[in-house]
Amino acid sequence: MPSLAKWLGDTLESVMASKFIQVKLTGKELVAPAVVKLYFEGNLQGIPFHEGNAVAFRVNQIDYRNYTPSYWDDSGCEIIVHLHSNGPGSRFFEQIQPGAQLKMLIPRGRKMFDNSFATHTVIFDETGLGYATSVFEASSKNGQEFYAFGNVPGPVNNIRFPFNATNAKNGQYHLLEQDFQAFLDRYWIAAKQGAFYMVGNGKLVQITRNVLRSRGIQRQQLFTYTYWIEGRKGL
């Protein structure tokens, strides 16, 4: 969601009160450098959730930030958040502690999972760990194949799925493409007829999509969602 004047945000929460759920932060766990998993409890019964949907929190008087849940059921959800010093959402969740009561805007937005495919491959960075987890959960539930390629800094702990990792820092696009090509070479026979989901940094999405198109992957197999772009206001 965009930034809103304080009075408009207050009005929104009043007029759309049924769209906001009261949740309690019950746990906070570091799973990777500058990446935390947040555990929320609340009455989510009857609220639909689809992989790729986002919830939103008001992180200060004027800013809302969207996050894709990694897990969702009737009694609570999990969200994986990338923390950095440049964004209001990052500052908010860096400071908040278990026990805090929050208003959460219910899931909405894109549906980024097509269960008509038998194989699902997710390409992501540290901002897409939550989404990748949700696709793993959905594909496992359906008995479908799942593969993952992540550009993340350092080791990742307590994530429910295995993935091939690279650590191509800003500007190291040749390394990102090289490692992604090697990943595809390893899993190509199994993955090439399936769906490919690319989320996170705009450059990661662009590079990996171009690689897949050059290998003959059709547009209807590709699903993309750019979460952030270098130089833009942070998460």
Residue ranges and their predicted role:
Residues 1-235:
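Extended, composition-driven regions rather than compact fold-specific motifs
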